């Protein structure tokens, strides 16, 4: 766009004709008109709507989780100290795109983890968790997506990931980051959140209830790319002012995510190992998560174990002091990582324990047995991009030899 001409000054300005009537004041720019987004519950038997028949589903609700996805493999897999870890625990944009297409093609539809179980009371008036009957489009299967560490940690900023989520001029969620040449990039094709948003816009039947995914947040380097965290070692008024500014900046992002089917869960404040931490440490960490993260995203009943490490009581019939404390703080669904979408309702306390499957480098490179755990979702041999990943080999049998 051409710049505005400079204002006239001196004699030239005095010769400018004055209009008979004052110009109309400039109008304020209009806020972007957001498309309405409908979120509904799959626990309601809606019968047949618009030619789609909804039928009860009491089987397994599958659950896949992802870490942040690699936008620029040339930065992620550059041979530095982080490269192998990224190769183990992440997928690339291209791999993520293919996974979304595969689960869609295989008849999965997204549901919100918060709709799968509910808190109720038993015949003695004691609180218990119950598994809800879901009503799913006939021929479809329910699927939960969750995303760990959607914080945009400092170390990731130079290793091929996007930097933060932002609101675009259209009112939608976009990602912001720098490409390998250092150019600013605002995109909806480089981040797991925005890619799924776009996929659902293009395939609305993938999310018949409006659900997207559950964002599992720590707090030690802020959330969603905004440095909303405190530091107990070095702090001053300037740092606090910047933190408050970041808190205000992230609020509209949170609101838009919630409006469009995203929910939030805790990944602990400090990504602590709940299997080896003391009760005092868990208490301090949980309070800090509630103060710095929960105060922004709102209450949640979902706890995603860092490292998949299970605290005491992560079995059906016994509960230790750490698990009991976490349940007393409002957590009801406790999610680890495993080889299937296992879930059990605990009998001694009002809680659910469950596992999630993890599409990542370790499972995409895994043995025939490992990739078999994922075969209902995709064929790992079709997903993995060995052209951009480090040359670390695979354990599965090639298709031509299988």
Question: For each predicted feature, which ranges?
Answer:
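Intrinsically disordered, low-complexity repeat and linker tracts
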Residues: 1-49
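Generic signature of intrinsically disordered, low-complexity, basic-rich segments
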Residues: 3, 9-14, 18, 22, ...
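Generic detector of bulky aromatic hydrophobic side chains
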Residues: 16, 21-25, 29, 253, ...
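C-terminal active-site subregion of NodB/CE4 polysaccharide deacetylases
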Residues: 31-116, 129-145, 153-157, 275-402
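Metal-dependent polysaccharide deacetylase catalytic core of the NodB/CE4 family, i.e.
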Residues: 64-76, 128-129, 136-143, 150-311, ...
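Short amphipathic alpha-helical segments embedded in low-complexity Lys/Glu-rich regions
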Residues: 118-120
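Extracellular/surface-associated beta-sandwich interaction domains
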Residues: 122-126
């Amino acid at each position: 766009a051409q710049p505005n001409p400079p204002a006239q000054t001196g004699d030239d300005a005095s010769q400018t004709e004055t209009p008979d009537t004052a110009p109309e004041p400039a109008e304020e720019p209009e806020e972007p008109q957001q498309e309405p987004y409908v979120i509904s519950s799959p626990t309601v038997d809606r019968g047949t709507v618009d030619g789609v028949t909804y039928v009860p589903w009491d089987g397994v609700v599958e659950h896949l989780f992802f870490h942040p996805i690699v936008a620029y493999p040339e930065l992620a897999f550059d041979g530095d100290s982080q490269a192998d870890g990224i190769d183990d625990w992440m997928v690339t944009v291209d791999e993520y795109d293919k996974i979304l297409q595969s689960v869609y093609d295989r008849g999965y539809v997204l549901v919100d983890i918060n709709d799968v179980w509910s808190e109720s009371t038993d015949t003695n008036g004691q609180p218990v968790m119950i598994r809800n009957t879901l009503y799913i489009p006939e021929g479809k299967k329910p699927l939960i997506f969750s995303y760990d560490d959607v914080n945009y940690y400092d170390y990731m900023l130079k290793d091929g990931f996007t930097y933060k989520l932002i609101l675009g001029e259209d009112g939608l969620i976009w990602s912001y980051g720098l490409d390998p040449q250092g150019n600013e990039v605002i995109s909806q094709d480089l981040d797991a959140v925005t890619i799924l948003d776009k996929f659902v816009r293009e395939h609305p039947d993938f999310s018949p209830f409006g659900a997207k995914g559950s964002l599992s947040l720590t707090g030690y380097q802020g959330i969603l790319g905004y440095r909303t965290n405190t530091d107990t070692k070095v702090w001053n008024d300037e740092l606090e002012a910047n933190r408050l500014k970041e808190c205000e900046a992230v609020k509209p992002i949170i609101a838009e995510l919630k409006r469009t089917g995203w929910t939030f869960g805790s990944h602990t404040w400090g990504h602590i190992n709940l299997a080896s931490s003391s009760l005092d440490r868990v208490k301090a960490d949980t309070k800090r998560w509630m103060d710095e993260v929960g105060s922004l995203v709102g209450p949640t009943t979902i706890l995603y174990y860092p490292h998949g490490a299970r605290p005491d009581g992560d079995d059906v019939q016994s509960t230790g002091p750490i698990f009991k404390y976490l349940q007393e703080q409002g957590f009801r669904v406790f999610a680890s990582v495993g080889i299937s979408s296992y879930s059990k309702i605990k009998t001694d306390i009002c809680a659910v324990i469950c596992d999630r499957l993890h599409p990542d480098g370790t499972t995409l490179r895994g043995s025939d047995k490992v990739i078999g755990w994922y075969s209902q979702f995709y064929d790992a041999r079709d997903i993995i991009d060995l052209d951009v990943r480090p040359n670390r080999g695979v354990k599965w049998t090639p298709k031509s030899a299988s």
